[in-house]
């Protein structure tokens, strides 16, 4: 009987699917790298979300591991090259949390433009800051979307009713343009200079270098906003903090960080930054969908 380790918290739908398929399953979350190394030789399959880092050391110890499933889209917490060297299959669930992530990106946009977190905090304290809070409307603005996969496409559809111009930076858009007449393809520099809101929904660069740095902020409108619900190393956090403090841009909303869990970060306490703890994909609905998808994929692989 195949055996699978679920090492991150997720919907119990995954466990039920494995059990239904007569696959032994252990749910052991919050383990350290060393703790995983001790037990991983027992397992044919492994399921993670974003907390577990599937390192080379873990893979070297995984003498029986055949498949690793990521309940989510990105696989940057898995050492994919090493897994391939060992003929281990790496699976993910693209699209499973796209709607949740796009909705959160939209929520971040609205929060930073309307200063909702500040309004909420001060009102709870009995401070009536009405005269000091003036928001910005979406209508007639330009939204720039970097990356046009499942999340980027969904976000573009969510904002259709706001009478916005939508610019997209995506290598693959030209071949799909007829399917998305409401957007316009743009090069990176034009997009960031023309957009009122720049929202990132792309992979990190292969070399690990940030896509947005001080030089880019200098090209942006001083009234513009940056949204990142993709990957933490896409934007240079120090440069972003400096850009906010120097007035190069008006604000930012960030859900992902260069180091997570983010116990300390240069953006903390910056009043122009709205920050959330990597929760874009964290909805009841998305957690069920990705758990179901990854469990079915791994079951099919191990049983066929």
Predicted regions and their residues:
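An N-terminal-biased, well-structured beta-alpha scaffold segment characteristic
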Residues: 1-91, 191-193, 213-219
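N-terminal Rossmann-fold cofactor-binding loop
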Residues: 8, 29-30, 168-172, 230
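Short, conserved active-site loop motifs that form the nucleotide-linked donor/cofactor pocket
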Residues: 23, 88, 183, 272-274
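Short, Asp-centered acidic motifs that coordinate Mg2+ and/or phosphate
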Residues: 44-45, 67, 197, 225, ...
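Short glycine-/small-residue-rich Rossmann-like dinucleotide-binding loops
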Residues: 51, 73, 196, 201-204, ...
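Phosphate-binding beta-alpha-beta segment of Rossmann-like dinucleotide-binding domains, i.e.
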Residues: 86-88, 93-142, 154-157, 161, ...
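Rossmann-like dinucleotide-binding domain for NAD(H)/NADP(H)
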Residues: 90-91, 165, 223-304
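Rossmann-like dinucleotide/phosphate-binding beta-alpha-beta segment
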Residues: 131-222
